[in-house]
Amino acid sequence: MEAITVMELKTLLDSAPDEIALVDVRNPAEAEVASIEGSHLVPLASLESGEAIDRVRGLAEGRRLLVHCKLGGRSARAVELLSQQGIAATNVTGGIDAWSQHVDPAIPRY
């Protein structure tokens, strides 16, 4: 499984934001507490049910698809599910928790 760190994600967001699509697979309540600017909320359950596959396919069109969650476990599962649907995706290791520790301490940890 392809993976990147939050520092690598920050570099991509700063240098080529139009070339990536960042998907957040946490629950809506979690996203209300903390989120990375520009991310698209697509809860893991909606990928597991299949209802959001086409939406993510559209987001990924012509862009590198990056997936994050709180710590990296749910996003790894999402990357697996997307791969099974023929959609290439990269896991953001450490998730938003690592983002708040290493990139933007203003993002609350929960």
How should these model regions be labeled?
Residues V67-H68:
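Short, surface-exposed ligand- or partner-binding patches at beta-edge/loop junctions that are enriched
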